[in-house]
């Protein structure tokens, strides 16, 4: 199936930040016992600490998955996420310059038409087929406020506390990971992104761009980044677009 899979990924510093703390990893060939692997991470911390947390967190995750003898995708990803959490937390605890650093992380693999997803923080995974669906649930203060009925989804988008997350990799000694799985269709497109995209571009606009049939997957990805920057580019932007069952011919 990987031979039919099309992938586009990008990060962009945005319009307001000097350092890019977002990090992406993509592989449409096996990583350990997983047939493919896709990761988006959005780091946080002063100076270069956020950049360090996201990049080294992802590298630790990939290293662990590469060496894991387990075949169950959920167990493989859980082991690797826990190892990455331990590594970031340890580094932040031992070195003052890295104190308080952490990262969001959304991890995905596609096996036999099924999508397996792990999530910590407010980076997102969407599936777009007939309509757009957010698969992950944000671990954020405003999402909790929405859940409790204190604000609605539109108010959450512009809320002054929208950047406060309630869960992050490396923030504590142990990490609670959410897992999701679903069956993909021939029409499914998977979008993974940091909040630099989802806070800047509304879901319906994302859906509109992904549904365009006059441009390539790469052009759709570039258009999403462009749209985020045109709307203010207030944060770093990271995206991965995946067509698991592409019927295009080179």
Question: Locations of the language-model features?
Answer:
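PP2C/PPM-type serine/threonine phosphatase catalytic domain
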Residues: 1-250
